[in-house]
Amino acid sequence: MPIIKVRENEPFDVALRRFKRSCEKAGILADVRAREFYEKPTTARKRAKAAAIKRLAKKLSRENARRVRLY
């Protein structure tokens, strides 16, 4: 759990913004959203595999674009 110390004479909205940023860095909201509903193991594997394919396609696309620019 991210903890922030409110500084002296610090406005509330600034402290809240720092807290939100620390929560975002810790990945709390993403974790809560992922665990909000039960996901069957087969669905989780399917989603992970699709994400891996998408990452690979993105990487290959970037490499091909780099090669084209070099010539």
Curated annotation (Swiss-Prot):
Transmembrane segments: none annotated. The keyword Coiled coil does not apply. One of its GO terms (biological process) is translation. The keyword Ribosomal protein applies. Keywords: Ribonucleoprotein, Ribosomal protein. It comes from the Bacteria. It holds the Pfam family Ribosomal_S21. GO terms for cellular component: ribonucleoprotein complex; ribosome. Coiled coil: none annotated. GO terms for molecular function: structural constituent of ribosome. Gene3D superfamilies: Ribosomal protein S8. InterPro entries: Ribosomal_bS21, Ribosomal_bS21_CS, Ribosomal_bS21_sf. Belongs to the bacterial ribosomal protein bS21 family. This is Small ribosomal subunit protein bS21. It comes from Shewanella piezotolerans (strain WP3 / JCM 13877). The lineage of its organism: Bacteria, Pseudomonadati, Pseudomonadota, Gammaproteobacteria, Alteromonadales.
